[in-house]
């Protein structure tokens, strides 16, 4: 942070590489790293799938099989319907979100300084610390909830669910509609803000620890064990947040698909 004040350093690290202005601006760094995370996921799983053997599996094959079986077990336990779409979706969500979260473990100055060599002045590498990304994923979950509700109950059932529940009387239709709509919208919004809030806080703590390195020797020396301790703890955070996002998605789809719900 040479030549920068603490506030300038923090502001610089929290600024996106973007194009456009206002609502229509596009965060190029978020798009790039989210796509990169997806490519890494697809590459690893496709490579393991092509090299899979019925003999003694390698370490990577064992890891992939453990993750696949674990996710499939969660879906089987919580989603009581056809799992041919939901299980791969849950696996994709967990692995993709985990990889995006894991980018936060890279030292905060490394990628921005590397990008600076190419004339890129701003770069935020953690897609899940961008509310635009988490809201985008949550909106997809929102439409999947509607899709599975219509698939299991039909469009008529969807209308009944949002007009005759929880009070099964025509006089309460406006109240029911407001209550059910708020409940429905709260699902993707809470899903997005939970992931964003945790990852943004984690990123900010890494930045604040990095600020310590520019202070006197005593404070800088304290920053090293703090950085290591937070990085170790953050491994739990990034894994837990990926699991929560996946788990809540499966639960929401299960509730939407449950024919006996109403």
From Swiss-Prot:
The membrane topology noted for this protein in its Swiss-Prot or TrEMBL record is: Multi-pass membrane protein
- UniProt entry tagged with the keyword Zinc: no
- Pfam families found in the cross-reference section: ATP-synt_A
Does the keyword section mention NADP? no
Which cell locations does it reside in?
Cell inner membrane
Q: Which keywords appear in this protein's UniProt record, sorted alphabetically?
A: ATP synthesis, Cell inner membrane, Cell membrane, CF(0), Hydrogen ion transport, Ion transport, Membrane, Transmembrane, Transmembrane helix, Transport
Question: Where does it primarily localize?
Answer: membrane
Positions of transmembrane segments: 26-46, 86-106, 130-150, 204-226, 240-260
Q: Which InterPro entries match?
A: ATP_syn_F0_a_bact/chloroplast (IPR045082), ATP_synth_F0_asu (IPR000568), ATP_synth_F0_asu_AS (IPR023011), F0_ATP_A_sf (IPR035908)
Q: Name a single GO biological process.
A: proton motive force-driven plasma membrane ATP synthesis
Gene Ontology cellular component annotations, sorted alphabetically: plasma membrane; proton-transporting ATP synthase complex
Belongs to which family? Belongs to the ATPase A chain family.
**Subunit notes for this chain?**
F-type ATPases have 2 components, CF(1) - the catalytic core - and CF(0) - the membrane proton channel. CF(1) has five subunits: alpha(3), beta(3), gamma(1), delta(1), epsilon(1). CF(0) has three main subunits: a(1), b(2) and c(9-12). The alpha and beta chains form an alternating ring which encloses part of the gamma chain. CF(1) is attached to CF(0) by a central stalk formed by the gamma and epsilon chains, while a peripheral stalk is formed by the delta and b chains.
The protein's name in its UniProt record:
ATP synthase subunit a
């Amino acid at each position: 942070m040479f030549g920068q004040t603490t506030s300038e350093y923090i502001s610089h690290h929290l600024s996106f590489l973007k194009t456009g202005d206002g609502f229509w601006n596009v965060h190029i760094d978020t798009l790039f790293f989210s796509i990169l995370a997806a490519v890494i996921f697809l590459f690893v799983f496709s490579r393991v799938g092509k090299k899979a053997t019925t003999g003694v599996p390698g370490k990577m094959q064992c890891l992939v099989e453990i993750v696949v079986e674990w996710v499939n077990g969660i879906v089987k336990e919580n989603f009581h319907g056809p799992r041919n779409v939901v299980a791969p979706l849950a696996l994709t969500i967990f692995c993709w979100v985990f990889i995006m979260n894991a980018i936060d473990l890279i030292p905060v100055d490394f990628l921005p300084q590397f990008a600076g060599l190419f004339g890129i002045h701003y770069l935020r590498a953690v897609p899940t610390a961008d509310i635009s990304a988490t809201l985008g994923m949550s909106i997809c979950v929102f439409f999947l909830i509607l899709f599975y509700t219509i698939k299991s109950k039909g469009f008529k059932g969807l209308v009944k669910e949002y007009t005759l529940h929880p009070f099964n009387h025509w006089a309460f239709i406006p109240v029911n509609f407001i209550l059910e709509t708020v409940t429905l919208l709260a699902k993707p919004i809470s899903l997005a803000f939970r992931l964003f809030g945790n990852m943004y806080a984690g990123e900010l703590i890494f930045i604040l620890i990095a600020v310590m390195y520019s202070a006197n020797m005593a404070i800088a020396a304290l920053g090293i064990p703090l950085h290591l301790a937070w990085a170790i703890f953050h491994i739990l955070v990034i894994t837990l947040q990926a699991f929560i996002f996946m788990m809540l998605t499966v639960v929401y789809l299960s509730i939407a698909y449950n024919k006996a719900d109403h």
